[in-house]
Every structure is written in C-alpha cells, then in structure tokens.
Swiss-Prot record:
The keyword Phosphoprotein does not apply. One of its GO terms (cellular component) is mitochondrion. The lineage of its organism: Eukaryota, Viridiplantae, Streptophyta, Embryophyta, Tracheophyta. It comes from the Eukaryota. Belongs to the PPR family. P subfamily. Coiled coil: none annotated. This is Pentatricopeptide repeat-containing protein At3g60960, mitochondrial. Keywords: Mitochondrion, Repeat, Transit peptide. Residues 1-18 form a transit peptide. PPR repeats lie at residues 87-121, 123-157, 159-189, 190-224, 233-263, 267-297, 321-351, 362-396.
Length: 403
C-alpha cells in the first residue's frame, strides 16, 4: 500500500491527536500580512439583549451586510461566546458568504483568524470553502497544499466534496494524471469524483480513456459501494449521452436515455443530470416530460435547470415542494411571469409565525419580486413589497428574544 493511500486511510480513522502535538498553521496560499486587516473586536461591541450570536450573524448575512457579519463572527472564538454547536457554524457561515460574494481575500483572512490565530478546530466544510476559493481563482496548487496539510495534520478528514472540488479543478487545468491519482487515493470510492474524470476525458475527445474508467467501475471487481452501484452507472451513462449529443449523434444519445430505468431517472441526482443534458441540447419536449415526472421530488437545482423554459408553459405549482419556492420565484420574475411568482410569494408569508423571523421570504426573494413588479409596470405593488421588506428587516434587528 502506498504512503499516500495509508495517509488517506488513517486520516479517516480518528480525529484525536496527542495533546503534545505542535500546532501546524493551515497554509493560506499567500503571506498572511498581505491579507485584509481585521480590526480587534471585543465583547462590548454588541448590546446586552439575550440574542444568540449565531442569530445575529445569520441576520447580517441575510441582509447582505457582510462587513458587520464579519465583525460579529469574530466574537465566536472568544471565551465568552465559545459554544460547541455554534462556533464553527458561525465561522463557516461568514466565510461561505464572503466566498459567494467573491471576496476571497476576506474569506481567507477570516479563515486565518479563526483557525490559525485563534486555533479553533475547523471541520471539513471550513477547509472545503477555502480549497474551492483557491480553485475558483485558478490557484490549484494552493488548494492542493491545504489538502495535503489536512491529510498530514489528521484532525480533519477530507470528504467527498473535497475530492470533487479538487478533481474538477485538476481536470479544468488539464492535469489529468494528477486527477486520476487523486481519485485512486480515496479511501472510499466516489462515483461523483470518477464522473468528473469521465466527463473531462470526453470533453477532450478521449473516448477510449473515458470508456476504460467506466468499464473498470461497472465490472465484477468494481470499487463502487453496492448501495451506489446502479445510481453511479446511470450517472456515467448520462455523461456519455451528453457526449453523443455533442457529436451530433442524437440517436445514440436517445438510446442511452431510453435504457435508463424509471427508478434511476426519478432519483434527483440522476434526474437533474438528465434534465441538464436535455436542456443543453434543446430537447424541450423530453425535458418537460421528465420535469413533469420529477416535480414532486425536484429540488432547487431542478428548478434552476428548467428556468429558461418557464416562460413557455404553465408549471403545476400545486405539486411543487415548498423548498423550491425560493428558486422558482426568482426564476418566474426573471421570465416575466410575475403573477405566478406572486402566488408563491404570498404562500410563503402564510407559513411565517409571528416570532419565527428567519422563515419566509429572504432579501433575494424580496428583490426579485420588486424587480418583477417594476418590469411589468406594477410600481405600486413594488413599493408595497419594498415596505414589507423593510419591516421584515427591522423585525430581525429589533427582536428581544433569541430563537
């Protein structure tokens, strides 16, 4: 067994480390002195109302006030606020928000403050956020350096998402040999990681290598976990379906689709991937048919994939899961179907309890409705919605009892 293989296996066994083990700072990909400076924050920065720090930070992030969220979050690692279930959640929330806003230097600066300077123990998500930040900026080697540090340190184990982020970055950089070594180093085979390799090889026209990987994984000695075997093969087949469409061989592509079992296609992961391919290649009839079958199990990704078609047909909203309302409202407004969005928007308010202020429409939904009303000339409704948004935000700030 190779050294790398042993390291990966051992890193997943236990997170415990000897007390005497010296702390090794997490690599940041840059000189810490070059990062944005963080002003000192003390406990006196916040008022004495009995509101949890976690709630305060979430409220600021929801209102897109990331600088205030950053200041508040830095209290999470102080002795007066350390809470096992909240501390790392708060850290990850603000780092993730900074990454979503593409404020990568701020995200890395916060990571350094929380997990190097304050020596709070991160979790896998904490590291994944920074690994992805490096990859998004094209700094793949910096991402790999942090990954290797995690393996050697042993207190945090890389997860499937870690390997997916790195595999995609390596494939995008045409570093296929390294991507293959990375995939083989996983202690537990993930079909999502191998699918990234298959799609990468197909994208550069290496059908033979993609097929070789597929055959190895569906053979009798497949490394795939038994419970994922059929779903994995369906995902791989969809990647080949996309390849044949790109080659202009629709008949071969549709034959793959016809051979997929209903139980496989109606799995959200597989179904979304099929929808993505159908929409990408203009197969509207087939996409709508599948969406109709999936609507009761669809998620926000399904809605996102189908969004460009919503202006063409009526969506059966009564069968839509409420977890999809957010994406659906934004999508409908963008495509001028404000009346349909309005119905879902009103329904979100019916579920809001007087004291449950983080339920119901968030800032993104309010903005979508306001822009939607303006785009169709309903200025009065836009103003009413703006006032509702202000009241909602004020209630978040004025609450007197922690959730």
């Amino acid at each position: 067994m190779s050294l790398l293989r042993r390291i990966v296996r051992n890193s997943t066994v236990s997170k415990a480390v000897p007390v005497a083990k010296a702390f090794m700072p997490y690599p940041l990909g840059r000189d810490p002195s070059s990062l944005p400076k963080l002003d000192p924050v003390s406990i006196s920065y916040i008022d004495s109302r009995p509101i949890s720090l976690r709630y305060r930070v979430r409220a600021m992030i929801e209102m897109s006030n990331l600088d205030e969220a950053s200041k508040l979050s830095r209290l999470a690692v102080l002795n007066g606020f350390l809470v096992d279930r909240d501390t790392v959640f708060i850290c990850n929330s603000v780092i993730g928000a900074m990454c979503s806003a593409k404020r990568y230097d701020d995200a890395i600066s916060l990571f350094n403050y929380f997990f190097n300077e304050s020596q709070t123990l991160p979790n896998t998500l904490s590291c994944d956020l920074i690994i992805k930040a490096h990859c998004d900026q094209g700094h793949v080697d910096d991402a790999l350096e942090l990954y290797r540090h995690i393996l050697l340190d042993g207190r945090v184990a890389p997860g499937i998402e870690t390997y997916m982020i790195l595999a995609k970055a390596l494939v995008d950089a045409k570093r296929f040999d390294e991507a293959c070594v990375l995939a083989r180093s996983m202690s537990c085979c993930s079909f999502m990681v191998y699918d990234i390799l298959i799609r990468g090889f197909l994208d550069i026209g290496n059908f033979v290598k993609a097929s070789q990987i597929f055959e190895e994984l569906k053979g009798l000695d497949s490394k795939l976990p038994g419970r994922e075997y059929h779903k994995a093969n369906a995902i791989f087949n969809v990647s080949f379906m996309n390849y044949w469409f790109k080659q202009g061989k629709d008949e071969e592509a549709m034959e793959i689709l016809a051979n997929l079992e209903d139980a496989q296609v109606l799995n959200p992961i597989v179904g979304n991937r099929v929808l993505q391919v159908l929409v990408k290649h203009g197969k509207k009839t087939e996409a709508w048919e599948l969406f109709g079958e999936m609507i009761e199990i669809c998620d926000s990704e399904t809605v996102d994939i189908m969004s460009e078609y919503f202006s063409e047909k009526t969506v059966p909203f009564e069968r839509l899961r409420k977890t999809c309302y957010r994406k659906m409202i934004v999508s409908l407004c963008e495509h001028g179907k404000v009346s349909d969005a309005e119905k879902l928007f009103a329904e979100m308010f019916t579920d809001v309890d007087g004291g449950d202020l983080l339920v119901g429409p968030d800032l993104l939904i309010f903005r979508a409705m306001i822009n939607g009303y303006v785009s169709v000339g309903r200025v009065d409704d836009a103003i009413k919605t703006l006032n509702k948004m202000r009241i909602s935000n004020l209630r978040k700030l004025a609450i007197h009892q922690a959730p």
